[in-house]
């Protein structure tokens, strides 16, 4: 990868489109940005959908205490649709174009090609962190059995979960990360936002263990950095999706 390939685009939006993030934010705009960050943090939307599902008698666990794959798929895809809809509404309300925020001035095909080797980089980061934790801080391995592994024990469930990790993982989370980083440009800067968003991303994976949360938080920072340098979500989406799919393949092959 050359330095030229990874050079960030020039500041400013597309011709004729106001560069909202570059404007000096007013106090009111900061308050609005904070509200949008909270609403698009994933916690409110998932809580609302989970409550709605429960009201209709559709609960996450079966009578035997196992996590329902149907619930996870339905919640993840519904949350993806709701969250993307919210972000598009907020962008429209501020006169921002989704293409400018999510794709920038980069062409899609070259960005997708860049994302492929970044899958390997993401794998290296994940392996290095987990190996370091296992060597120097084994107490952080707080979950012996990842509960999500039970969702992919059959070919049908594996395919369903693959859909989830691509659509709700790779696509939704990278669009969400880009939107939140954009809003943090009004709330202390993108670098500050990268730290906050990465910590929140890691915290969302505590169900899988503290070590997994550290690894995923670091990976979130990596993908966020790629977005900030490229101003396009395409490479992070490809890298994130590929990383998730390889994790499924790993479990199917070696069983852990």
Regions found by a protein language model. Give the residues of each.
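Juxtamembrane helix-loop-helix connectors linking adjacent transmembrane helices
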Residues: 52-74, 95-168, 186
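Alpha-helical transmembrane segments of integral membrane proteins
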Residues: 29-37, 71-78, 110-118, 156-160, ...
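N-terminal, membrane-interfacial amphipathic/helix-forming hydrophobic leader that caps
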Residues: 1-102, 109-110, 135-136, 248-256
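Transmembrane helix-loop-helix hairpins at the membrane interface
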Residues: 16-19, 123-127, 135-256
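Alpha-helical transmembrane segments of multipass membrane proteins
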Residues: 41-49, 79-83, 118-130, 223, ...
């Amino acid at each position: 990868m050359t330095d030229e390939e990874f050079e960030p685009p020039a500041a400013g939006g597309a011709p004729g489109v106001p560069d909202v993030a570059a404007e000096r934010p007013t106090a009111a705009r900061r308050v609005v940005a904070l509200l949008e960050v909270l609403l698009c943090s994933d916690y409110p939307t998932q809580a609302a959908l989970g409550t709605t599902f429960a009201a209709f008698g559709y609960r996450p666990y079966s009578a035997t205490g196992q996590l329902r794959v149907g619930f996870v798929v339905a919640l993840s895809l519904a949350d993806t649709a709701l969250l993307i809809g919210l972000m598009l509404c907020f962008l429209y309300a501020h006169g921002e174009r989704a293409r400018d925020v999510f794709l920038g001035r980069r062409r899609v095909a070259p960005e997708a090609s860049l994302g492929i080797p970044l899958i390997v980089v993401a794998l290296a980061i994940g392996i290095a962190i987990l190996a370091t934790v296992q060597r120097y801080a084994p107490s952080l391995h707080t979950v012996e059995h990842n509960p999500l592994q039970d969702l992919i024990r059959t070919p049908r469930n594996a395919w369903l979960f693959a859909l989830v990790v691509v659509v709700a993982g790779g696509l939704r989370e990278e669009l969400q990360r880009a939107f939140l980083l954009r809003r943090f440009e009004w709330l202390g800067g993108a670098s500050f936002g990268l730290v906050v968003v990465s910590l929140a991303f890691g915290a969302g994976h505590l169900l899988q263990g503290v070590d997994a949360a550290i690894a995923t938080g670091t990976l979130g920072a990596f993908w966020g950095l790629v977005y900030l340098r490229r101003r396009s979500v395409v490479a992070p989406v490809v890298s994130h999706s590929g990383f998730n799919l390889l994790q499924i393949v790993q479990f199917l092959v070696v069983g852990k």
